[in-house]
Amino acid sequence: MKEIISVTILLILIMDPLGNLPIFMSILKHLEPQRRKKILIREMMIALLIMLLFLFAGEKILIFLNLRAETVSVSGGIILFLIAIKMIFPTYESKKKSGNIIKREEPFLVPLAIPLVAGPSLLATLMLLSHQYPKKILYLIGSLLIAWMITVVILLLSDIFLRLFGSKGVNALERLMGLILIMLSTQMFLDGIKSWFYI
């Protein structure tokens, strides 16, 4: 049970629904509310299929590449640490890229499903998890589905969240999520180091 909760929290933090709220709203704001919901659900379904594919194929990919679990754990911890740093200290360039991603036409696959939800960092994490817990794939699927559903709900209720917290409140929550992700990534890194040196 603890593993499901920790993996679910990790996946939610990487999906970063609060950080993606303003981008999703900007991309879909020119559409009718009903059409907006349909597109959002469609894109989230596509993202889920892609994430499940990487979760199931991740173990086989890592075996094919002949990577040890310790190596994947250390490198995964470093990647997640860098993501968390960007969440806490967003740079001007990252904000500029977020602004450039906004388009007026109706989105399909890119940029909502990929890379905003099913981004490279999340897909790499799913591969890592499937490699670390090959016998607990059902637990991983459950964690992924819970994280995905929470993300869907937050994005569907984007208007309410932005009215409730405001842009500054959402930014503060995202920084808090980044702080939690730093702790999780550090633990992942240390676990990999301990396993490598048989501590």
From Swiss-Prot:
The keyword Repressor does not apply. One of its GO terms (cellular component) is plasma membrane. It is found in: Cell membrane. The chain crosses the membrane at residues 7-29, 39-58, 71-93, 108-130, 137-156, 176-198. Pfam families: MarC. Keywords: Cell membrane, Membrane, Transmembrane, Transmembrane helix. InterPro entries: Multi_antbiot-R_MarC (IPR002771). It is a multi-pass membrane protein. The keyword Cell membrane applies. Belongs to the UPF0056 (MarC) family. This is UPF0056 membrane protein bbp_399. It comes from Buchnera aphidicola subsp. Baizongia pistaciae (strain Bp). The lineage of its organism: Bacteria, Pseudomonadati, Pseudomonadota, Gammaproteobacteria, Enterobacterales.
